[in-house]
Amino acid sequence: MARRPDLKTGPARLAALVRTSVPPMHPAGLPFVGASLAVALAGRKSRWLRNAGVASAAANAAFFRHPPRTPPTRPGVVVAPADGLICLIEEAVPPSELRLPATPLPRISIFLSLLDAHVQRAPLGGEVIAVEHRPGLFGSADLAAASADNERNSIVIRSPEGAEVIAVQIAGLLARRIVCDVEPGDTVGLGDTYGLIRYGSRLDTYLPAGSDILVDVGQRTLAGETVLAELPR
């Protein structure tokens, strides 16, 4: 009779520990990790090249990590679309390319450093009704001017109850690629992954007027988990 693997001490246990300890990686990171490992393999006879390739692979795997998150279950909330630091809370007109009324709305800006996970998650569950990309500059994403001047990609999500929330991916000083995996007509759940920005960036979230903001400037957020606000009733 064949023996069952020992899940407490055997290789299966080690594999389980690795799976629970090391977060998965977003598919967008595979080319970067693969290229770094290829450099390490090609330069395996050179200690410098080998170490540089392995270090680059590890850094890219960490940058593109895609940690699991558990969204809140209570209704009527907006969650953070990104990990990072809240750098601004103010009222501002939504991006002009969305062709929405020029009425200022509450806006929460989250700055992502190189050390943060850079996947973006839906701040609201519902239907994606608009996606608009606008070319721009690549200034420092923590500056107030970044919302207006930098390259950006905006999505509008409408909940089944009719509330609309805007999430804007903004490229930063090092960011050169905004990835958005949703299109108008798609349905997203609260906290679902919808995109990524490579190497330093910012996320602006525009809320419906009358929303009750529950966070402060300087507070850190976890994408898909931190509640930014309660929608007006």
Swiss-Prot record:
Note on how the cofactor is bound: Binds 1 pyruvoyl group covalently per subunit.
Enzyme superclass (EC): lyase
Biological process according to GO: phosphatidylethanolamine biosynthetic process
Cofactor dependence: pyruvate
Pathway: Phospholipid metabolism; phosphatidylethanolamine biosynthesis; phosphatidylethanolamine from CDP-diacylglycerol: step 2/2
Enzyme Commission number(s): 4.1.1.65
PTM entry text: Is synthesized initially as an inactive proenzyme. Formation of the active enzyme involves a self-maturation process in which the active site pyruvoyl group is generated from an internal serine residue via an autocatalytic post-translational modification. Two non-identical subunits are generated from the proenzyme in this reaction, and the pyruvate is formed at the N-terminus of the alpha chain, which is derived from the carboxyl end of the proenzyme.
InterPro entries per record: PS_Dcarbxylase, PSD-A
Active site positions: 201
Keyword Transcription regulation belongs to the record: no
Catalysis: reaction(s): a 1,2-diacyl-sn-glycero-3-phospho-L-serine + H(+) = a 1,2-diacyl-sn-glycero-3-phosphoethanolamine + CO2
Modified residues (Pyruvic acid (Ser)): 201
Keyword presence, Lipid metabolism: yes
Bilayer topology: Peripheral membrane protein
GO cellular component: plasma membrane
Family: Belongs to the phosphatidylserine decarboxylase family. PSD-A subfamily.
Self-association state and partner proteins as the record states: Heterodimer of a large membrane-associated beta subunit and a small pyruvoyl-containing alpha subunit.
Official protein name in the record: Phosphatidylserine decarboxylase proenzyme
Species name: Mycolicibacterium vanbaalenii (strain DSM 7251 / JCM 13017 / BCRC 16820 / KCTC 9966 / NRRL B-24157 / PYR-1) (Mycobacterium vanbaalenii)
Lineage: Bacteria, Bacillati, Actinomycetota, Actinomycetes, Mycobacteriales
